[in-house]
Each structure stands twice: as C-alpha cells, then as structure tokens.
A protein has these predicted regions:
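The first (N-terminal) embedded transmembrane alpha-helix
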Residues: 9-30
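Cytosolic juxtamembrane helix and N-cap/initiation of the first transmembrane helix
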Residues: 1-16, 43-46
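Membrane-helix interface motif
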Residues: 24-36, 65-68
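Alpha-helix boundary/interfacial micro-motifs
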Residues: 10, 35-37, 72
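Alpha-helical transmembrane segments of integral membrane proteins
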Residues: 39-143
C-alpha cells in the first residue's frame, strides 16, 4: 500500500469519525428530551446511540491502523499490509453500522414506513458488502 493511499485512508476515516460524533450529538440534542418524556421507545433510542458509538470507535480504530500503515520506513511491508487489512475491516464495520443508524432513528420516532425502506436499503448494502468486500480489500503481503 502506498504512503499516499494510507494518508488518504487516514483522512477519510477521521472525517467519518468526526461526522459520526456530530450525528451522535445531534441525536442527543433532539431526541433526548423525547426520551426523558417517554415519547420514544427507550430501547430503540439507546440502540441507536450504541450503534453510533460502535461506528465512531470503529472508524477511530481504522484511522489509527491506517496512520500506522502510513509510517514509511518504520515498519515492514508485511506489517503494513496487516495494519491496512485491519483498518479496512474497522472502516467497513464503522461505515456499515453508521448506515444502520438512520433506520434506527426513523423507527425511534415512529416513522415505520420510511424506516422500513431505509432498513431494506441497508440490507441490500449489507449483501453487496458481503459479496464484494473480500474482492476489494487489501491483499495479504505474501500474495
């Protein structure tokens, strides 16, 4: 993996983690008062916050792995490939869970029809990822 690509992956993951934190804050600001008043499903609200936490920290871990992979001359190519593969997996987990959050929010505020469409699209995305991610992830160093 080239240094430029590793640096790009660091920036991409960092930006998505920051976006995830902003979405988390937005949800707390607008949905927490409804949660306190009992106007939304507490299980769904908390599940959404957990999903955003998993997404955020997965993206942060991806950023750290990509950053370590970008350190030229300090690590071997085998270790760089391993760090990049781990970063790819953390990034995919964070991105996938972050895409689940909108449907959870929509279910939380009782917009069931719209939430169902979002969930169906997320499931299509999940099937697409299961099928194609193994083909596009960073290859092992020995290959």
């Amino acid at each position: 993996m080239g240094e430029d690509l590793a640096a790009t992956n660091v920036n991409r993951s960092y930006a998505l983690a920051a976006t995830s934190i902003a979405i988390f804050t937005f949800m707390l600001f607008f949905l927490y008062p409804r949660f306190e008043n009992g106007r939304i499903d507490p299980w769904l609200f908390q599940s959404t916050l957990v999903a955003m936490g998993v997404a955020t920290f997965s993206l942060v871990f991806a950023t750290l792995h990509y950053y370590r992979a970008s350190l030229a001359g300090r690590i071997s190519e085998d270790e760089r490939a391993l760090l990049t593969r781990r970063g790819d997996r953390f990034w995919l987990l964070g991105y996938t869970v972050m895409f689940l959050a909108p449907s959870l929010v929509l279910f939380t505020v009782s917009l069931v029809a719209v939430a169902s469409v979002w969930l169906a699209l997320w499931l299509v995305y999940l099937l697409f990822v299961i099928r194609y991610f193994p083909k596009v992830q960073t290859p092992r160093a020995s290959q």
